[in-house]
């Protein structure tokens, strides 16, 4: 069943003042017509369409018996087949004035005239149609001053409301004036109102005429307010449109007058400058044609238009880009070597590769050179290497920071249709450099993110691919720009963070951490002079002896790079600067024993001997994104049921390494002289300190084996040894990565002997010579080699001894 409330006003009309009679008797059931979204008032005429199956039968029964219908509103319009409980209790008795069946869809169209109110009493079942016992509610015709006064006000307010309707005529006002009964007047006006069916039902259920008039008055007042507000909004909108059209017409007339008088100097000057800039930019023909077309649009555009400034900004971007390729300076390899040696200490392998790169470019300037990616921990000189390449090539240097970039538009730019659109970071950097053959450093390439606005790493593929970047198209520019002459250099901390397709387009150069000797040389050559200048001091005012500098490196920093070292040196010089500012004649010599009063207590000290003085404690080596580090592993045994307890936030790989190590120890009880008959009566607890730091990796197997074996043998591990390597269940020591970083970490921690897999022997060539000379390396084929080398021969008498 559907009843469209939008059709109510079009076919509603007053039916007169006399109370209509009905052929239904109070003791006969009344056939019900449930409706969804319309309320029929007494005296009103409404069209209905019966489309639901049961409702069709109800209508047919009423027409066949020539009986009236009980039109009643459903409580929930979503109910398809309403029951007695789904209907409101008060409805309107209606006579069927007209009835037509549609041949297309079989729907029943009928026009009903409301007669009087009724109240549902009880449903009547078994008739084949929906019917109910009802109680008629005849309209009271008693008149009193209160009712008459409200009726008069309602008549006036209704006329006011009709006057605000856009297409209402005087016939409706005259029809309302002809109604004398106040109750019928209220019903008629309520039926005309555009208010929700629930509110109309509330008025229908108000039997007291005085209260009904009040409710209709409130509804009419609300509609008047809405109509007035709508009228005001419409007038304001029309006024704004008219004003805008008037202003546009006046501006066009003013522009015509100014053109005739030659007074439009400012915009003409701007167009003239852009025309000259296009001619001087030496753009490719395709780009120049596009720019002149945009300039023509600009000349025809009103200066006050919002598009005017956008077009000017776009043309400025096009003309300020370095389109022609400048002449390249010849590459001087000797000068390049001198620049690299002056700016960087150590890094011989990396500097040699950069010189090879420059040599190839000198011999084949038009060849497709590889893209170098400097990979290493923070503070080892990745960015400064890019600057040195730019100095050696005598090209401008520009840096593009990619850390945290998660929107593809930051690489390719935004389309001009967006408010505040700008070119991407690549084009912006080229304009900043002022040359199409600049050296561009893509910093923190491994920190590229990925969000809902696309994948920036995928956008970088077009930038770095030599086959595509000759016609790179920025979304803002909309024209191709040649990036093939740019020397791209990238930096990253972790290779895992670089997308695979990007890695394939680059040559990775590892920059390891510095040794203590290298840090000392870097501090003397670069950091100390730089911090002296930054603090406004001279060498005569502050003296930093070699012993003090080594103490700062050893006791106050422990990093792969030198940034923290530079901060500590700066803190010392700032302390001296304060003294000099107070007394210009001051000369300070900072001895090592004064560092504690300036920098505080020592932050790092060697604790290897203390940690490994007991059985079950071994020093392992770990690799981190910021360099190598020492990893202490502790094992202990307690009475229990043979459980293995692991703590220290170990990852899945390390947990499996401990399981494999324990199994290997059990399988070698005889050779290790361990009584394994009580394994099921003891729990073994393996702990890696610094439990707040997650740890994982495939290189702790040998260290785990040594820790458990040392514990069960009751023998301590040598305090000057550290070990790395993975194991198999056959006891074979497997190779691992990060050897150089791990060895340098051992050197910083005071370790003199490093045990590592024999298959990692070629990696020792990457370790600086001075570091190799200070250490002893033991190559392991099996875990038996590690036991012989690192576990002391004599048992330690301690409460930690375990007899299993």
From Swiss-Prot:
It is found in: Cytoplasm. Residues 30-224 form the Lon N-terminal domain. Its main location: cytoplasm. GO terms for cellular component: cytoplasm. Keywords: ATP-binding, Cytoplasm, Hydrolase, Nucleotide-binding, Protease, Serine protease, Stress response. One of its GO terms (molecular function) is ATP hydrolysis activity. Belongs to the peptidase S16 family. ATP-dependent serine protease that mediates the selective degradation of mutant and abnormal proteins as well as certain short-lived regulatory proteins. Required for cellular homeostasis and for survival from DNA damage and developmental changes induced by stress. Degrades polypeptides processively to yield small peptide fragments that are 5 to 10 amino acids long. Binds to DNA in a double-stranded, site-specific manner. This is Lon protease.
């Amino acid at each position: 069943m559907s009843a469209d409330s939008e059709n109510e006003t079009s076919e509603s009309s007053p039916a007169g003042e006399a109370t209509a009679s009905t052929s239904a008797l109070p003791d006969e059931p009344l056939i019900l017509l449930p409706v969804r979204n319309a309320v029929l008032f007494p005296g009103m005429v409404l069209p209905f369409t019966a489309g639901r199956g049961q409702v069709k039968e109800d209508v047919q029964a009423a027409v066949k018996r020539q009986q009236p219908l009980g039109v009643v509103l459903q409580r929930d319009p979503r109910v398809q087949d309403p029951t007695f409980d789904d209907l409101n209790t008060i409805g309107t008795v209606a006579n069927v004035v007209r009835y037509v069946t549609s041949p297309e869809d079989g729907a029943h169209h009928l026009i009903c005239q409301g007669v009087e109110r009724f109240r549902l009493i009880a449903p009547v079942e078994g008739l084949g149609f929906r019917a109910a016992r009802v109680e008629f509610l005849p309209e009271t015709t008693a008149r009193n001053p209160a009712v008459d006064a409200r009726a008069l006000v309602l008549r006036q307010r209704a006329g006011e409301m009709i006057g605000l309707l856009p297409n209402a005529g005087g016939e409706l006002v005259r029809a309302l004036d002809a109604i004398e009964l106040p109750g019928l007047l209220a019903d008629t006006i309520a039926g005309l109102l555009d208010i929700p069916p629930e509110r109309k039902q509330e008025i229908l259920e108000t039997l007291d005429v005085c209260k009904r008039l009040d409710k209709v008055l409130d509804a009419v007042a609300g509609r008047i307010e809405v109509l007035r507000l709508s009228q005001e909004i419409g007038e304001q909108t029309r006024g704004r449109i008219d004003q805008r059209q008037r202003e546009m017409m006046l501006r066009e007339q003013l522009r015509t007058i100014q053109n005739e008088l030659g007074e439009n100097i400012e915009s003409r000057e701007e167009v003239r400058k852009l025309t000259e800039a296009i001619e001087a930019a030496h753009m490719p023909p395709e780009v120049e044609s596009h720019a002149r077309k945009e300039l023509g649009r600009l000349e025809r555009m009103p200066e006050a238009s919002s598009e005017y400034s956008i077009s000017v900004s776009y043309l400025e971007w096009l003309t300020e880009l370095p389109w022609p390729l400048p002449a390249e300076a010849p590459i001087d390899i000797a000068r390049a070597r001198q620049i690299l040696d002056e700016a960087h200490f150590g890094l011989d392998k990396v500097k040699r590769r950069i010189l090879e790169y420059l040599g190839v470019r000198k011999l084949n300037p038009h060849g497709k050179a590889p893209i170098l990616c400097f990979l290493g921990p923070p503070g080892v000189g990745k960015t400064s290497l890019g600057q040195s390449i730019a100095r050696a090539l005598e090209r401008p240097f520009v840096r593009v920071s990619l850390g945290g970039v998660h929107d593809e538009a930051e690489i390719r730019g935004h389309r001009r249709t967006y408010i505040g659109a700008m070119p991407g970071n690549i084009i912006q950097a080229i304009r900043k450099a002022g040359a199409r053959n600049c050296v561009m450093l893509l910093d923190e390439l491994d920190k590229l993110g990925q969000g809902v606005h696309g994948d920036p790493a995928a956008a970088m593929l077009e930038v770095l691919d030599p086959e595509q970047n000759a016609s790179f198209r920025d979304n803002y520019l909309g024209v191709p720009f040649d990036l093939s002459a740019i020397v791209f250099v990238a930096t990253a901390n972790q290779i895992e963070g670089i997308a695979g397709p990007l890695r394939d387009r680059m040559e990775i150069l590892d920059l390891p951490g510095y040794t203590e000797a290298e840090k000392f040389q870097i501090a003397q050559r670069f950091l100390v002079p730089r911090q002296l200048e930054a603090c406004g001091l001279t060498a005569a005012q502050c003296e930093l002896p070699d012993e003090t500098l080594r103490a700062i490196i050893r006791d106050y920093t422990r990093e792969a790079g030198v940034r923290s070292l530079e901060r500590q040196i700066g803190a010392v010089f700032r302390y001296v600067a304060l003294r000099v500012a107070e007394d210009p004649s001051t000369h300070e010599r900072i001895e090592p024993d004064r560092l504690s009063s300036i920098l505080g207590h020592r932050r790092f000290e060697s604790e290897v001997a203390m940690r490994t003085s007991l059985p079950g404690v071994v020093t392992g080596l770990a690799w981190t994104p910021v360099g190598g580090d020492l990893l202490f592993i502790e094992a202990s045994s307690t009475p229990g049921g043979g459980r293995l307890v692991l703590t220290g936030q170990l990852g899945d790989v390390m947990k499996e390494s401990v399981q494999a190590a324990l199994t290997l120890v059990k399988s070698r009880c005889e050779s290790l002289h361990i009584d394994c008959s009580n394994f099921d009566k003891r729990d073994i607890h393996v702990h890696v300190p610094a439990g707040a730091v997650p740890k994982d990796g495939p290189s702790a197997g040998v260290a785990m084996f040594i820790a458990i074996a040392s514990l069960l043998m009751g023998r301590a591990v040598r305090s000057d040894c550290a070990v790395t390597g993975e194991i198999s269940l056959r006891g074979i020591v497997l190779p691992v990565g990060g050897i150089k970083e791990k060895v340098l970490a051992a050197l910083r921690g005071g370790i003199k002997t490093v045990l590592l897999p024999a298959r990692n022997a070629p990696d020792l060539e990457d370790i600086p010579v001075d570091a190799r000379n200070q250490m002893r390396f033991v190559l392991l084929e099996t875990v038996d080699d590690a036991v012989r080398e690192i576990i002391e021969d004599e048992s330690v008498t301690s409460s930690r001894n375990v007899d299993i």
